[in-house]
Amino acid sequence: MAERTFAIIKPDATRRNLEGPILSVIQQNGLRVVAMKKMRLTREQAEGFYHVHKERPFFASLTDFMTSGPIVAMVLEGDNAVARWRELMGATNPENAAEGTIRRQFAEGLEANSVHGSDAAETAAFEMGYFFNAMEITG
């Protein structure tokens, strides 16, 4: 059964015009983009999106980074979309990411790791709703 997940192409990747190569990986691996928008997050939007990390020591640098340039927010759909997207992204730390994963290919570092993905279906539901309303998601 088709599942949906949320994905972001982060500012380090948009700065290097990697949207196309990353979208190719997504589409070549059985996921469909059913919603997409390019935008620049405000401080408030970034802090709201990453609110679960508010007490963590990296919160300020993460929100600074995520507001440093445009992002591409997406809803992806396909069989086991959450797990499949996480597999395609690779480990959070690109040094630990498997060969052929997006982070191994494109990431600049731990924070500037090119992409974000929901870690569970419940998280995906919140994250999709944060960026898209139901009318913006096709499928």
Curated annotation (Swiss-Prot):
It is found in: Cytoplasm. Homotetramer. Signal peptide: none annotated. PANTHER family: NUCLEOSIDE DIPHOSPHATE KINASE, NUCLEOSIDE DIPHOSPHATE KINASE DDB_G0292928-RELATED. Its EC number is 2.7.4.6. PROSITE patterns: NDPK_LIKE. The keyword Transmembrane helix does not apply. It comes from Oleidesulfovibrio alaskensis (strain ATCC BAA-1058 / DSM 17464 / G20) (Desulfovibrio alaskensis). Gene3D superfamilies: Nucleoside diphosphate kinase-like domain. It catalyses: a 2'-deoxyribonucleoside 5'-diphosphate + ATP = a 2'-deoxyribonucleoside 5'-triphosphate + ADP; a ribonucleoside 5'-diphosphate + ATP = a ribonucleoside 5'-triphosphate + ADP. NCBIfam families: PRK00668.1 (NF001908). ATP binds at residues 10, 58, 86, 92, 103, 113. The gene is ndk. The keyword Metal-binding applies. Its cofactor is Mg(2+). The active site is at residue 116. This is Nucleoside diphosphate kinase. The lineage of its organism: Bacteria, Pseudomonadati, Thermodesulfobacteriota, Desulfovibrionia, Desulfovibrionales. Major role in the synthesis of nucleoside triphosphates other than ATP. The ATP gamma phosphate is transferred to the NDP beta phosphate via a ping-pong mechanism, using a phosphorylated active-site intermediate. It is an enzyme of class 2 (transferase). GO terms for biological process: CTP biosynthetic process; GTP biosynthetic process; UTP biosynthetic process. Keywords: ATP-binding, Cytoplasm, Kinase, Magnesium, Metal-binding, Nucleotide metabolism, Nucleotide-binding, Phosphoprotein, Transferase. Disulfide bonds: none annotated. One of its GO terms (molecular function) is ATP binding.
